[in-house]
Amino acid sequence: MRKLLFEFEDLSWFPDTIRESMTDYLRYFLKVTKFYKPVIPFISEILKQTNHQNIIDLCSGSGGPVEEVLSGLNATSEGNIKVTLTDKFPNISSYTLLQNKYPKSISFESTSIDAKNVPEELKGLRTIFSGIHHFDEVSIGEIIHNAIQNNAPIGIFDGGDRNIFMILGIILFHPLLFFLFTPFFRPFRISRLIFTYLIPIIPFCTVCDGIVSITRLYAPEHLERIARVHDEARYTWKSGKVKNSLGMNVTYLIGSPKR
């Protein structure tokens, strides 16, 4: 079933203007709802355990929850946590906006970065937010294997529950959120207004991708099973679910080199 489904934003030919507007919406939604707030303590713990202050965020989209996560981490950290945003299709305008807002904390890679083959010079805790469901089991194994080969700790986080209520919520509420909040999304784009209100391609594709995303979600034990297949007992793994303020489950898989 997974192989038969696709998400528009994964397609190489999909227009950047539409893709970036979709991920800009996701960043706004994740920030306003504090979607990933419950996993910040996990990230803080693994940073301290591995003595890292750098986060290499993979599959960043438009930045996802980076502002919320960074704020939470720096509130409890003794040092200044730094985040490098990366993506296969980097959203340069959004990354620049975030970098200008947090010049001492956020940087980005302007070239395409494959989560399965991260450059060795990008050192730190690797994170993936709302992205792992885009990959099949083989690709997830390659992502984890690459982290292990580079002795990099990794945290994978994905939100939502695989049920009909989640799908109905996406169908009913996301179009309304687009209608109400699109003028507040940054960076401002005229094209975003056109393809939201006049020709609603952005909301349509976002809702379609959201529905497919729900059907593709992985259970935490599934992710941990994939991880252990690629790990020769070199890493400590922890997986599970925590509820956020919306009452939705956030799945997590965290791995770090054994000390």
Task: Label every model-predicted segment.
Residues 1-57, 62-64:
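Class I SAM-dependent methyltransferase Rossmann-like catalytic core
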Residues 3-7, 209-259:
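Conserved Class I S-adenosyl-L-methionine
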Residues 147-163:
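Conserved beta-strand signature within the Rossmann-like core of class I S-adenosyl-L-methionine
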Residues 126-128:
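A conserved beta-strand element that flanks and buttresses the S-adenosyl-L-methionine
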Residues 135-150:
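A short, conserved alpha-helix within the catalytic core of class I
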Residues 53-120:
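Class I SAM-dependent methyltransferase SAM/SAH-binding core
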Residues 131:
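Hydrophobic adenine-recognition pocket in adenosine-nucleotide-binding enzymes
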Residues 167-227:
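C-terminal alpha-helical "lid/dimerization" subdomain adjacent to the S-adenosyl-L-methionine
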